[in-house]
Swiss-Prot record:
GO terms for molecular function: DNA binding; DNA-binding transcription factor activity. GO terms for biological process: negative regulation of DNA-templated transcription. InterPro entries: GntR_C, TF_FadR/GntR_C, Tscrpt_reg_HTH_GntR, WH-like_DNA-bd_sf, WH_DNA-bd_sf. Residues 9-77 form the HTH gntR-type domain. Was identified as a high-confidence drug target. The lineage of its organism: Bacteria, Bacillati, Actinomycetota, Actinomycetes, Mycobacteriales. The keyword Nucleus does not apply. It comes from the Bacteria. This is HTH-type transcriptional regulator Mce2R. Induction: Expressed in mid-log phase cells and in gamma-interferon stimulated, mouse macrophage-like cell line J774. The keyword DNA-binding applies. It comes from Mycobacterium tuberculosis (strain ATCC 25618 / H37Rv). Negatively regulates the expression of its operon as well as expression of end (endonuclease 4). SMART domains: FCD (SM00895), HTH_GNTR (SM00345).
Length: 240
């Protein structure tokens, strides 16, 4: 029996989770009015301050709109939420949502080659040593999950070297969403994505100051990884 640590949530967090889940699954569609604060407290068996705190969090996450003295309504999270919502969207009822994985991988393919190009243009001397450390880890690591974390570290260095705060913040959101999926994708990654030579080719292009070569190497690496990953995920889903 695989036991997991027990997580003790606060009451406001429990309220937040219940309402957020209903919003994200469509159980509560955009525009629907929530019960009053008093009624929510009665239905959930909690205090009004706990409900109030949960509603503040839901509002900050772009899931509801709270109007003082008026009803609280569900917002369309696709229009109002931020990238920090991605980790919640990846898993629905404990299952990996393939459509969200596909969106993340497509966004990675569109953005990361440009980041590699920028890093090669800047060609910061300290980047070479950092990437070599990552490459050594990729060459020797046996554990597939840890290996994938090393690839994320590799891209961490590339993103920092590109010098774009927007790309940096987008990468933070990507990593926060992607990293929790590593255990679920271990089998796929072992077979399809463990290609340290592709990362070495990319590192060589960046460190030699070759923007065109770096962009192409990143494009090739990510296209292959995306194609292999999605093929296995779709195959697994069809068997369920």
């Amino acid at each position: 029996m695989a036991l997991q640590p027990v997580t003790r949530r606060s009451v406001p967090e429990e309220v937040f989770e219940q309402i957020a889940t209903d919003v994200l699954t469509g159980e509560m569609p955009p525009g629907e009015a929530l019960p009053s604060e008093r009624r929510l407290a009665e239905l959930l068996g909690v205090s009004r301050p706990a409900v109030r705190e949960a509603l503040k969090r839901l509002s900050a996450a772009g899931l509801v709109e709270v109007r003082q003295g008026d009803v609280t309504t569900v917002r369309d999270f696709r229009r109002h939420a931020g990238l920090d919502l991605l980790p919640r969207l990846l898993f629905r009822n404990g299952e990996l949502d393939i459509s969200v994985v596909r969106s993340i991988l497509e966004a990675r393919l569109r953005n990361f080659p440009k980041v590699a190009e920028l890093a090669a243009e800047r060609n910061e001397p300290e980047l070479a040593e950092l990437l070599q450390d990552s490459l050594r880890a990729l060459d020797t690591e046996e554990d597939p999950i840890v290996w994938q974390r090393h690839t994320l570290d590799f891209w961490d260095h590339v993103v920092d070297s590109a010098g774009s705060i927007v790309d940096r913040l987008m990468y933070n959101a990507f990593r926060a969403a992607y990293e929790p999926t590593l255990a679920a994708l271990t089998t796929t990654m072992t077979a399809a994505a463990k290609r340290p030579s592709d990362y070495r080719k990319l590192a060589d292009a960046i460190c030699s100051g070759d923007p065109t070569g770096a962009k192409k190497a990143a494009q090739d690496l990510l296209e292959l990884a995306n194609t292999s990953l999605m093929a296995v995920l779709v195959s697994q889903a069809s068997r369920q």
